[in-house]
């Protein structure tokens, strides 16, 4: 999706005030359901971390974090988090969680280099979750079973919203479809990765694409991933077909996390082996951190999807350029 897309004849199904009420109801329901389904405990999350810790999410490796210094500790370069992908794994260790237990956070982040459009904002709000598994559970079966459990939360949330607001129609299929990024490329060799996502989601409605970060047979990647949290062979994206846009929309990115071997392999491929010296990476390589599975689920994306909104700014307060604000107002898109 480029810049701003205006759905033809768009009219919001809820007023501004109804939207605010629905956002709270939806978030509360989803959060409770997710915690029960995955056995997660809510914990407090940092808004910023010390750059030298290696805990911030480097995303695709080119995005600049918001950084600042502070009077009390001028020697530190402090960064607003991009996500808590690595912090959560360390927290599971520090809080002495056991196998089968996990945590989740109500995470807020700023991604200053995000390209703004209907589904992208510099303000990111998501449920970041992480759960301890055994090394023997680092396999596709564990990944798929966890995805199915999360999809069950999405289905229950849609039922909840439709029951409260009957003029919102159900669109999610009964089951989630799995496909690897290589199978997807083989299926649609002439399409871009984003076009492939829409093609497969139009066919099946809800899809989990497995294996993101490494190169495909074509020599291209399906998408970029940081080399030091997801195992690129055991991760993926959860996408739904969104009729309002006639496109696939990503609701969650998740995966089984790197072990010692896959971390070293991926750091070498990504040409950033110097990260091995950072405290987080040292702990991982020394076997001090638990093996985990985890991910992030976009709160505003979920609200936008289930409330059938045309712009993420209808469900969160952020910054938008004047042209986008004006065009939205002219087309019944009321930004918060």
Curated annotation (Swiss-Prot):
Disulphide bond pairs: none
Pathway in which this enzyme or protein is active: Amino-acid biosynthesis; L-asparagine biosynthesis; L-asparagine from L-aspartate (ammonia route): step 1/1
Keywords: Amino-acid biosynthesis, Asparagine biosynthesis, ATP-binding, Cytoplasm, Ligase, Nucleotide-binding
GO MF term set: aspartate-ammonia ligase activity; ATP binding; catalytic activity, acting on a protein; transferase activity
GO biological process: one example: L-asparagine biosynthetic process
The protein's Enzyme Commission number: 6.3.1.1
Presence of keyword ATP-binding: yes
Reaction equation(s) it catalyzes: L-aspartate + NH4(+) + ATP = L-asparagine + AMP + diphosphate + H(+)
Top-level taxonomic group: Bacteria
Assigned GO CC terms: cytosol
UniProt subcellular location: Cytoplasm
A Pfam family assignment: AsnA
Predominant localisation class: cytoplasm
InterPro entries membership: aa-tRNA-synth_II, aa-tRNA-synth_II/BPL/LPL, AsnA
Entry's family note: Belongs to the class-II aminoacyl-tRNA synthetase family. AsnA subfamily.
Protein name as catalogued: Aspartate--ammonia ligase
Gene field: asnA
């Amino acid at each position: 999706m480029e810049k701003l897309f205006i759905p033809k004849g768009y009219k919001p199904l809820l007023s501004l005030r109804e939207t605010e009420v629905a956002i709270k109801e939806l978030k509360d329901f989803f959060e409770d359901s997710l915690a029960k389904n995955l056995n997660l405990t809510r914990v407090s999350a940092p808004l910023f971390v010390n750059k030298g810790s290696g805990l911030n999410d480097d995303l695709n490796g080119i995005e600049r974090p918001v950084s600042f210094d502070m009077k009390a500790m001028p020697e530190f370069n402090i960064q607003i988090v991009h996500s808590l992908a690595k912090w959560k794994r360390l927290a599971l260790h520090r809080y002495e969680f056991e196998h089968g237990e996990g945590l989740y956070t109500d995470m807020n982040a700023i991604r200053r280099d995000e390209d703004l459009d209907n589904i992208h904002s510099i303000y990111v709000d998501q449920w970041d979750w992480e759960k301890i598994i055994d090394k023997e559970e680092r396999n596709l079966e564990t990944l798929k079973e966890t995805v199915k459990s999360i999809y069950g939360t999405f289905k229950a949330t849609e039922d909840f919203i439709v029951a409260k607001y009957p003029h919102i129609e159900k669109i999610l299929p009964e089951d989630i479809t799995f496909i690897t990024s290589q199978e997807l490329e083989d299926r649609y060799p002439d399409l871009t990765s984003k076009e492939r996502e829409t093609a497969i989601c139009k066919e099946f409605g809800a899809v989990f694409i497995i294996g993101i970060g490494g190169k495909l047979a074509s020599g291209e990647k399906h998408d970029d991933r940081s080399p030091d949290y997801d195992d690129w062979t055991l991760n993926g994206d959860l996408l739904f077909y969104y009729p309002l846009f006639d496109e696939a929309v990503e609701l969650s990115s998740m995966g089984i996390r790197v072990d010692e071997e896959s971390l070293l392999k991926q750091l070498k491929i990504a040409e950033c082996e110097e990260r091995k010296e950072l405290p987080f990476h040292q702990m991982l390589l020394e076997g001090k951190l638990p093996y985990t599975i985890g991910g992030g689920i976009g709160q505003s994306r979920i609200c936008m999807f289930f409330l059938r909104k045309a712009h993420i700014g209808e469900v969160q307060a952020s910054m938008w350029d004047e042209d986008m604000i004006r065009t939205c107002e002219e087309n019944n898109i009321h930004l918060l």
